[in-house]
Curated annotation (Swiss-Prot):
This is Desmin. Gene3D superfamilies: 1.20.5.170, Single helix bin, Vasodilator-stimulated phosphoprotein. SMART domains: Filament. Residues 134-143 are annotated as: Linker 1. The gene is DES. It comes from Gallus gallus (Chicken). Its main location: cytoplasm. Homomer. The lineage of its organism: Eukaryota, Metazoa, Chordata, Craniata, Vertebrata. GO terms for cellular component: cell-cell junction; cytoplasm; dense body; intercalated disc; intermediate filament; sarcolemma; type III intermediate filament; Z disc. The modification Phosphoserine is found at residues 7, 23.
Amino acid sequence: MSQSYSSSQRVSSYRRTFGGGTSPVFPRASFGSRGSGSSVTSRVYQVSRTSAVPTLSTFRTTRVTPLRTYQSAYQGAGELLDFSLADAMNQEFLQTRTNEKVELQELNDRFANYIEKVRFLEQQNALMVAEVNRLRGKEPTRVAEMYEEELRELRRQVDALTGQRARVEVERDNLLDDLQKLKQRLQEEIQLKEEAENNLAAFRADVDAATLARIDLERRIESLQEEIAFLKKVHEEEIRELQAQLQEQHIQVEMDISKPDLTAALRDIRAQYESIAAKNIAEAEEWYKSKVSDLTQAANKNNDALRQAKQEMLEYRHQIQSYTCEIDALKGTNDSLMRQMREMEERFAGEAGGYQDTIARLEEEIRHLKDEMARHLREYQDLLNVKMALDVEIATYRKLLEGEENRISIPMHQTFASALNFRETSPDQRGSEVHTKKTVMIKTIETRDGEVVSEATQQQHEVL
């Protein structure tokens, strides 16, 4: 807005001074006392966009303006010049010139400020580019390699722990199989023990039966002995009675010789009874001895079986105790292994959770670094856009300055030509041409996901 206002003031001042419409545009010229030309160089920036990335193009323009025409025209006038009108016009022109110098000084100050600002922004841009290059070359690769190495180490640890856990599980399964076999053997030994106890109970019943039979036989022997003693006593009493009767009847026997001999009969009877008693006693003793021998043999057999059963029972009891101790030891080992397995599972779960947290934290840091890089790239792009805008504004001010110089030089030439009413065309003026050399620099920056993928710079030279 201020630029347009200054430009309108300058145009209106020239209209007031020289009249007419807008001043024509001529190449930039400089006045000098000697007839030599001067060259003025200006830089025009052209902004073009390629692939959504702004680029900056610079046009360097060189203009050569002859200056001998004004000097020749002024010298060729001679004494015909009339300065009465020129003095009045020069006063107003000097006033306008002074105002324009003040405005040009302000423009120069603003231009210097813009140059300082551009230099500062270029320094900041260089710092940001260096920071982006440092972050691009340092952080992502090194952090990624470090994290990948740590992840590989964690995976190796997890694989080792998994193999160790598999070995522990195999050992646990083997111990469970051994424990199952021992339990099966224990059941078999318990069954054998029960069978031995049943046999022992049967043997005890046989021993009890044999003992009862022996007691019964002993009782029968005692009864037979008592019966034999009773029979002996009865026999003796009968013999005494018979002897008494024989003594009482002795006389009668003697007197009666023809009667049978009772003594011989009694002896025969006694002999018969004694033989019968002896036979019964012998049979009873033989039967008793046979029974006693049978019972003794049966008792010996039962005692041997009982001792064998007791010995087997002691062996089984020792085996049961040893198996019980072994089962208790295996149970303790199994409990310790299960406890170790639970502790290892808990530790592995905690380590896995820590590793997951570390991975999440590292991924978050990577995302943060990518966001920082994207932010730096956006800031770099914004600074580049600001720089291009400032370059465009500087080029605009330069055009305005050149336009002011051209506008100042052209009215003076017209004033001298109208006052002198003289027009001359010098060979230098006829031969002078405006040569424009344009250099186009195209800088292409390709970005992808906030990261700079490639940069390319291209220059084109054209002569107009």
